[in-house]
A protein has these predicted regions:
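Phosphate/dinucleotide-binding and metal-coordinating scaffold of catalytic cores
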Residues: 1-162, 166-169, 178-197
Length: 197
């Protein structure tokens, strides 16, 4: 099944994707928010937080950018096959530069927070993005008035680790692993997986 989907993406027509004309730059990959790599990521946010658009700085290397886009789309298909939640993703274009749109998974009354912010909520200052750290945070959150299903929380983190191993993802860190915080119930859960390339 995945090979059939891979063939579908091999002949992708990016021009048929969305045209994003109301976006604003929210983050560039690399240290201090500025791209330091030859092929850094550039993130844009659609109005009202509906989605984010990710592209790359490699404007003269279309094949590399297209392969990264295809990788992101294939990872979404893999997530679906192995039962890991992943937001809707589709190819898009902004000012003639191709990328992918990842739609917001937070519903009304929910906030999307990254692992770094989650560590701060749990008053955990020595966060190192390890499995043990997430188990510790799941134990600590109720102390600060948050609800968490520890078993599901830790299980979801393990699934992500296994998925990243299978897909050779070496860039999963505290700023691209997300959690959903329900503002009324104060429940925290692992968010669908984004930024898989």
């Amino acid at each position: 099944a995945i090979l059939k989907n891979t063939e579908k993406y091999a002949n992708i027509k990016l021009a048929k994707g969305l045209l994003l004309d109301e976006t604003k730059t929210v983050r560039r990959g690399g240290e201090s928010g500025v791209s330091t790599k030859k092929y850094g990521k550039v993130w844009f946010c659609l109005p009202k937080g509906r989605a984010i658009f990710k592209t790359y700085d490699d404007i003269f290397c279309f094949d590399i950018r297209q392969n990264r886009i295809i990788n992101e789309l294939i990872c979404k298909e893999l997530c679906n096959l192995v039962g890991i939640r992943c937001p809707e993703i589709e190819p898009a274009s902004k000012n003639g530069v191709e990328g992918v749109v990842s739609y917001n998974v937070a519903k009304s009354g929910e906030e999307l927070i990254n692992a770094m912010k989650l560590g701060k909520i749990a008053h955990f200052n020595d966060f190192s993005n390890s499995l043990e750290d997430y188990a510790y945070i799941a134990d600590e959150l109720p102390i600060y008035g948050y609800n968490v299903d520890k078993r599901k929380f830790v299980e979801d983190i393990y699934k992500i680790c296994i998925f990243d191993f299978i897909t050779m993802q070496t860039d999963r860190h505290e700023c691209n692993l997300f959690f959903i915080k329900n503002k009324s119930t104060r429940e925290i859960s692992v968010a669908p997986l984004i930024d898989n390339e």
